[in-house]
């Protein structure tokens, strides 16, 4: 079961093999195994944060196109005041705008 769990976290087969070898060595490797789990937990937390940001973007785009469908056009939606957006989507729109500005500055 733990091997399946480690696979799902994205741990490499090389690292999973290392974990198995350490586990077979017994209690002398507890600290090393703990460190492996801590590192993999940090990797997974970073992936989850990235996925949450992606989900937030999709939520914003769903709202955007639902609003466009109700209005019959996408025109002007980007110019709506923050108060017109659901509160949870306001920081998402701000992040997307900042990213778009950064991209245009790089060009």
How should each PLM-predicted stretch be described?
Residues 1-107:
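Arg/Lys-rich, alpha-helical DNA-contact motif
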């Amino acid at each position: 079961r733990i091997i399946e769990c480690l696979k799902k976290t994205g741990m490499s087969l090389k690292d999973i093999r290392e974990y198995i070898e350490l586990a077979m060595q017994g209690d002398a490797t507890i600290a090393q195994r703990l460190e492996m789990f801590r590192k993999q937990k940090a990797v997974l937390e970073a992936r989850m944060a990235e996925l949450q940001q992606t989900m937030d973007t999709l939520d914003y785009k769903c709202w955007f196109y639902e609003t466009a469908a109700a209005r019959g056009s996408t025109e002007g939606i980007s110019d709506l005041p923050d108060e017109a957006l659901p509160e949870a989507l306001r920081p998402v729109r701000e992040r997307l705008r900042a990213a778009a500005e950064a991209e245009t500055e790089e060009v």
